[in-house]
Amino acid sequence: MSWKTLDDMDVAGKRVLLRVDINVPVEEGQVTDRTRIDRIIPTLQDILAKGGTPIMLAHFGRPKGKVVPEMSLRVTLPALEAALGRKVTFIEEPNAERLSDLPEGIVVLLENTRFAVGEEANDPEMARFLATLGDVFCNDAFSAAHRAHASTTGVAHLLPSCAGRLMQAELSALEAALSTPQRPVGAVVGGAKVSTKIALLENLVARLDVLVIGGGMANTFLAAQGAKLGASLMEPDYMETARTIMQSAERAGCKLLLPVDGVVAREFKAGADFEVVALGKDTVLAEDQMVLDAGPQSVAAVMAAFRTLKTLIWNGPLGAFEITPFNQATNATALEAARLTKSGALISVAGGGDTVAALNQAGAAADFTYISTAGGAFLEWMEGKTLPGVAALQG
């Protein structure tokens, strides 16, 4: 796949309409996690260094085409200015005339694109309006690339377009992990439900050498083999799907790793009493028992598998990582992946949902090769889908 980057564009003296994702968590009017803001700073600095004027487009929350004051992007200004080290000009009601003669070195943030009813509908009229506000379009919001919206896709077809530095890094990392990986390649797919990751699992078993399944999802796979897992989180309606995925993995030569032991408790709370129980097709738990984490034998098997790999993709935790003592499997395996990455033995790419939080909690995130801040876009890429925001940049 080929796409243009800022290296391919002459932005000197031009207004660069820059789509970013600064949909950050806010409490009591304060940004509580600046990660997404920090990640767009290299693109802003690059545009400024090349003599361009960045005009940021972004969404915030889900106002559904209405002006909702508490979803104004104004709340992000202090964090943006602190990260960038310069003033950012906020414009609530932009128009072409107002943005036609901006002073050199100015950085502009426009109001929430989703206040406009045409944004999520990818309305051609809104796309044409946005195109009047800039000379070049730069998309740095991979995390919104799975949405065909006016500010991600529509405007990209109307202006010379390229990927920003964050988008470029995301695409390069994901292509290296899935499209052209160093083999053997494996993945960890965890989390609560099989139902949300069917397409992902179906796509991965055809591409991987090793697939580790963990979290509540693993319970459904074990139940599909005959295990009786008491009050454990599982999806009986998806047991047949689990069997199909296991058969597909076998046909494709993909080694499927399910837990062989589990941390079992009768209460889902911090510090709950627990025991380690062997897991397999003949396992029978009491009606009030729950599998809440993978056990030590499972952890050892996963870590041994990691040591055979050259590329690892990680999506989802191996247990109820939010609560001690059910975070042990996620923490131990994440730290092993981080160690292997740091030693140069492994390329590791992670993203989606709870994954970033789990790896941060484990203290492993800093040593992974790449961690994607994207949720849905990361998953859809891993499912093999074409992302509209990326497709619009090709050529």
From Swiss-Prot:
Catalysed reaction equations from the record: (2R)-3-phosphoglycerate + ATP = (2R)-3-phospho-glyceroyl phosphate + ADP
EC number(s) stated in the UniProt entry for this protein: 2.7.2.3
GO terms classed as biological process: gluconeogenesis; glycolytic process
Keywords tagged on the record: ATP-binding, Cytoplasm, Glycolysis, Kinase, Nucleotide-binding, Transferase
Name of encoding gene: pgk
One Pfam family per UniProt: PGK
GO CC annotation: cytosol
Binding annotation for substrate: D21, I22, N23, R36, H59, F60, G61, R62, R114, R147
Pathway linked to the protein: Carbohydrate degradation; glycolysis; pyruvate from D-glyceraldehyde 3-phosphate: step 2/5
Paired cysteines (S-S): none
Enzyme class: transferase
Subcellular location(s) per record: Cytoplasm
Oligomer and partners: Monomer.
PROSITE patterns: PGLYCERATE_KINASE (PS00111)
Stated family: Belongs to the phosphoglycerate kinase family.
InterPro entries: Phosphoglycerate_kinase, Phosphoglycerate_kinase_CS, Phosphoglycerate_kinase_N, Phosphoglycerate_kinase_sf
MF annotations from Gene Ontology: ADP binding; ATP binding; phosphoglycerate kinase activity
Binding site for ATP: K197, E322, G352, G353, D354, T355
Protein name: Phosphoglycerate kinase
